[in-house]
């Protein structure tokens, strides 16, 4: 739940379809993920501003500097799911500067933005308060409270979900290096 200068926005997070991205968001929001912007134990998003607002497009927040240039001190890969698209207003998605540059910044759409599909990870949608999203102005502040409903949500470990996702990235990189070395060995053997 986002509590903003304008009112409350309730979002449903897609933790089963984008566990790494949701894990990052939840762990930061609850103050459980190490980062360079705030001490561990302090909820990351509390007091941050919506630093970028483009009417009839989206509102963006999550930058610790309030300028759009900040991050938590790390970046992580995109996590696209075929069922999750920017198909209408109220889509919660990661803001980034290109592939693999996700951190803490996010945006919520005012309208459908299909040109962002495959470029920005969708990880939730507004279920209450789209009128508040539409009323947010640049500089409005937020706090984020994670409302865990049901046994699955209560027992879900956000930090573990994010670390698992990051571990898969490391495995993908190592596998790619192994394949490149194999190819290099094959090419070298022919000379």
Outline where the language-model segments fall.
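Cyclophilin-like peptidyl-prolyl cis-trans isomerases
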Residues: 1-191
């Amino acid at each position: 739940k986002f509590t903003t200068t304008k009112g409350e926005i309730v979002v449903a997070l897609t933790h089963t379809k984008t566990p790494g991205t949701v894990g990052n968001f939840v762990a930061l929001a609850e103050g459980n993920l190490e980062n360079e912007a705030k001490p561990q134990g302090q909820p990351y998003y509390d007091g941050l501003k919506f630093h970028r607002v483009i009417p009839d497009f989206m509102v963006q927040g999550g930058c610790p500097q309030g300028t759009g240039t900040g991050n938590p001190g790390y970046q992580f890969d995109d996590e696209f799911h075929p069922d999750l698209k920017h198909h209408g207003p109220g889509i919660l998605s990661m803001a980034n500067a290109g592939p693999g540059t996700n951190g803490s910044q996010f945006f919520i759409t005012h309208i459908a933005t299909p040109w962002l599909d495959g470029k920005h990870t969708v990880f939730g949608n507004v279920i209450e308060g789209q009128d508040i999203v539409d009323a947010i102005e640049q500089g409005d502040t937020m706090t984020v409270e994670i409302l865990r409903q049901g046994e699955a949500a209560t027992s879900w470990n956000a930090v573990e979900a994010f670390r698992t996702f990051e571990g898969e990235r490391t495995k993908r990189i190592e596998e790619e290096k192994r394949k490149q070395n194999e190819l290099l060995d094959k090419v070298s053997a022919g000379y």
